[in-house]
């Protein structure tokens, strides 16, 4: 089965790795000219980390992220309102990580290229439109500064955010 993923963000890249784990070879179309480490810090809860660990990424993430130990809320004068343990300190089998969003995306992109090959992520490829028949999905894609191309896949997953086609 040939699967296209529109969007090379955290969701699209994670999906590509999950599909590869079950024997499929998806292709990710990302309109940005390259995967860049942009964004802000995020907290990834143990439920998400468990999924990423199942994809074999725990060691890579642990080497660049901060294990979040405690969540603390304080008043403006510094008095504790609440303090709660997080991740392994809260009894989960995996940590909660604080990580830069772009660094997480980089780990995912590197894993996709390592496992599926350099053609698995097509950066600089904007999905313009798609049409579906009983047998296939046709994608109209414009590579950066080039002529529109058509690709045929069995399925298309939209992971391209709020401006999705």
Region spans (language model):
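Beta1/beta-strand and adjacent pyrophosphate-binding region of the FAD-binding site
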Residues: 1-11
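Conserved N-terminal helical subregion
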Residues: 3, 47-165
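Conserved Rossmann-like nucleotide-cofactor binding loop
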Residues: 11, 34, 163
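A short, Lys/Arg-enriched amphipathic alpha-helix followed by its capping loop at the start of a domain
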Residues: 15-24, 51-54, 115
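Active-site beta-strand/loop signature of hydrolases that rely on acidic residues for catalysis
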Residues: 16, 30, 157
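Glycine-rich FAD pyrophosphate-binding loop
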Residues: 20-40
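Conserved N-terminal glycine-rich FAD pyrophosphate-binding loop of Rossmann-like flavoproteins
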Residues: 34-53
